[in-house]
Amino acid sequence: METAILVAQLCATASLAAWLTIGVKDNILIPSLNEPYTADVMAMVEMEKEYPEAHAHVAHRAITNRTVQRTAFYIVVSMELLATVLLWIGTIALLMALFGTATVDTARSLALYGTTAFTAVWSGMLIVGNHFNYWFSHEGAQNTHYQMTLWGIGTSILIVAGS
């Protein structure tokens, strides 16, 4: 049973690592895929267009300074990169534990650091997005952030419960 649990933990952690690797790679190499949308959320552009009365109550929250918007985007990318590295370290450690070249407790701890960082990235997006009321006009992004948060939590539970 211990081997099956380790395999499940390994696959779940590696899946998070692989998924986030693609995202962070694109954010580094092709920032135009996401950065303008981050700026749009921070400036509350769509909310102002689609829900002007609601926007009037929270318009003071908008950040339109492009330097601040870009800086925020690259802070997020840095956090994604950190989470990706931690996830791959956890994945490698779990693989090593599976083959007896690392302790299971250490491997699970390292994987848990990665899943915690992954979850923090996406829950952070939910929190910041909430500040900018992004549910008014960016439901798809909010849904993705919820799904990623839940995926991270689920993987963390698998690691802890399987200990």
Please identify what each model-predicted range represents.
Residues 1-67:
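Long, hydrophobic N-terminal alpha-helical segment
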Residues 54, 70-72, 154:
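Short, charged low-complexity intrinsically disordered segments located at boundaries
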Residues 2-26, 74, 85-163:
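Extended, low-polarity transmembrane helix blocks
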Residues 61-83:
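Individual transmembrane alpha-helix segments
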Residues 42, 79, 83, 89-90:
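Generic secondary-structure microfeatures
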